[in-house]
Amino acid sequence: ARDIDIPLAQRHFYYHAGMAQLMESELPDAAALGVCGQVIPWNFPLLMLAWKVAPALAMGNTVVLKPAEYTSLTALLFADICGQAGVPKGVVNIVTGNGAVGEMIVSAEVDKVAFTGSTAVGRRIRGATAGSGKALSLELGGKSPYIVFDDADLDSAVEGLVDAIWFNKGQVCCAGSRLLVHEPVADLFYAKLRARMDKLRIGSPLDKSIDVGAIVDPKQLASITTLVAANTAGTTHVAPCDLPVEG
């Protein structure tokens, strides 16, 4: 929140506020779409909101946004700030709830649907909007390979991998969750990686000196635990750590 979510959200609103002033000169033939239905995930609550809301408002649209169940308070606080800033009622609308509420937004009489989330849900939204005339934008999760060649600076590559896969506790749609290493340096790289993993600090995400904080909710913890337990192929390295009892 301190290093990414809040500062980047501020920059997005600043940028699109400038675009709003240049719309007539830079986009003379563009017109507002109308009502934009938007659904966002929980990994960057304010930044995901900014990506959806800022450009839509800048181009003269109104929005109906559904935040993730786990991070609704951020969006509700944003709505309160909009009211304090004088944004007219009905321009920014926040609706909370589970996936069924997201389906309501997709099926409603909106002019555009914007979704950030899983590929499986994105496919369902694409099918639901096909032939409807609604504009659609999808930003879907995937597997990003992290590739290490034999001429790489291995120490720097290890640090880069740590950032790629454990930044925000790995809760990033483009996290480097696949590692491909050139065979001549594979054993040395794996040894350096294991040593670095053993030094990762676990604790409160509010502590800036911590490497890995809490994930979003118990369901995610159970899912991750199941994936780790099911990974019996090949060599497995489990870095020792003391997990917090609470929080």
Walk through the language-model features, giving the residues of each.
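Long amphipathic alpha-helix in the N-terminal Rossmann-like dinucleotide-binding domain
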Residues: A1-M23, Q220, I224
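A general structural motif at alpha-helix termini
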Residues: D3-I6, T96, E109, L161, ...
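Short amphipathic alpha-helical/adjacent loop interface patches that line ligand
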Residues: I6, Q10, V53, A75, ...
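ALDH superfamily catalytic-core signature
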Residues: K112, A120-G247
